[in-house]
From Swiss-Prot:
Taxonomic lineage of the native organism: Bacteria, Bacillati, Bacillota, Bacilli, Bacillales
Tagged with keyword Transferase: no
Annotated compartments: Cell membrane
Protein name, UniProt field: Uncharacterized membrane protein YjzD
Organism, as annotated: Bacillus subtilis (strain 168)
Keyword Chloroplast belongs to the record: no
Amino acid sequence: MRYIIAFIWTFLLSHMACYLVASMNSVTYNFKTSSVIAVVLYVLIMVLAEIMPMNKNASQH
């Protein structure tokens, strides 16, 4: 379930960012390019989440 929610948030936030950047640069918004960027970001986030060590003991801050 966390993978689905992470994909939805990554998809929405990357599309929002691409739309804002496109409008600030006075270029047209491209849904296909934004979707590719969203998928790449999702894969990077999931890989980093698996690589990073988890802190098993929360009392050691």
